[in-house]
From Swiss-Prot:
Classification via Pfam families: 7tm_1
Species this chain originates from: Homo sapiens (Human)
Annotated PANTHER family: NEUROPEPTIDE Y RECEPTOR, NEUROPEPTIDE Y RECEPTOR TYPE 5
Membrane topology recorded in Swiss-Prot or TrEMBL: Multi-pass membrane protein
Signal peptide start-end: none
CDD domains according to UniProt: 7tmA_NPY5R (cd15398)
Tissue: Brain; hypothalamus.
Domain of life: Eukaryota
Keywords: Cell membrane, Disulfide bond, G-protein coupled receptor, Glycoprotein, Lipoprotein, Membrane, Palmitate, Receptor, Transducer, Transmembrane, Transmembrane helix
Protein's name in the database: Neuropeptide Y receptor type 5
Gene Ontology CC: GABA-ergic synapse; neuron projection; plasma membrane; presynapse
Gene: NPY5R
Molecular function GO labels: neuropeptide binding; neuropeptide Y receptor activity; pancreatic polypeptide receptor activity; peptide YY receptor activity
Any GO BP annotation: negative regulation of synaptic transmission, GABAergic
Localization per record: Cell membrane
Amino acid sequence: MDLELDEYYNKTLATENNTAATRNSDFPVWDDYKSSVDDLQYFLIGLYTFVSLLGFMGNLLILMALMKKRNQKTTVNFLIGNLAFSDILVVLFCSPFTLTSVLLDQWMFGKVMCHIMPFLQCVSVLVSTLILISIAIVRYHMIKHPISNNLTANHGYFLIATVWTLGFAICSPLPVFHSLVELQETFGSALLSSRYLCVESWPSDSYRIAFTISLLLVQYILPLVCLTVSHTSVCRSISCGLSNKENRLEENEMINLTLHPSKKSGPQVKLSGSHKWSYSFIKKHRRRYSKKTACVLPAPERPSQENHSRILPENFGSVRSQLSSSSKFIPGVPTCFEIKPEENSDVHELRVKRSVTRIKKRSRSVFYRLTILILVFAVSWMPLHLFHVVTDFNDNLISNRHFKLVYCICHLLGMMSCCLNPILYGFLNNGIKADLVSLIHCLHM
């Protein structure tokens, strides 16, 4: 993660031929720049402290809950644990160092930390984002291949190793292209003596812009696409499963109403061999017929071998009219007219409706939770990436007076994702929620 002054000084460092003019003209701008957040520094300190503590404690609880159930390892829980660990690193590396640089207007941690800390900040944020992609891919695989789901702990280890390798590889240019700059040499003022700033020093602007665009693609656009595709697939599968469940319950209701008429309607009909054959036929082919507007009529007796040849095609009409005039409802060939449930089927129908309502409520809950996951990621990280892109292409669009304030707002929104990830991936996860509740009770006692 870049420091807030990088874009401002990259242009100054690239114009070394005009150093004298820069010293005379930029010093008043530095004073104006320095006073941009002085009125809000206590508010920023309190806000950063609150966000950091909330993110640290929430992710620490997730780690403790997952460590408690180590005997029930799953790939998703393993990834959620690594997500909590990477979010803790984001809180530890990004919040204190960034806030200190913003409020004190200098880098106080030495030359070595100037090369290491931006690299660690970038790696922690990138790893957290790549783990979100991994969780989305695993969920997509579990939905598309529920029966052949053979993801083991080794697959989780492989995913985590790949994620950390990609994080180190993508962020590897940052230690090379960061340098410590003395402000007295840059601005030519004795008031800025012994003050240093850690800034990016790319060979040219094109390198810096290329790196910013790469981070935008890997840290924002790619995760957003993966989360959207995966969670859309999950919601669609749940919706299809709900539809199949509802259809199956309605079909069972139709057959139960047909096979078990009300006791008030008369004596039970004893099924003959042909009726049993017709019942097995409707069970086998019940999905071909309409669920709510289908009933069954009595099946004709199967003709014997002796009079089979006597049944001529012209007699089919009379047989059909004879069947349609019957008033008994026993298993047979379905026809399309509305069936009215008997009184003794009210309890069964009520159970069916309650089951379908419960499944619909659960599916809506999953849909809302997955939608919130996508929105939280999109809203929290979009301002910071837009800020870096805008300042890299044209740093004059944001005035020096409001530069640090805008950066702090964007940076705090990004940090909020570290506070919300434990809630979205941990506290709303039914498998982890019970362990979290028991853990909180133990800590409270």
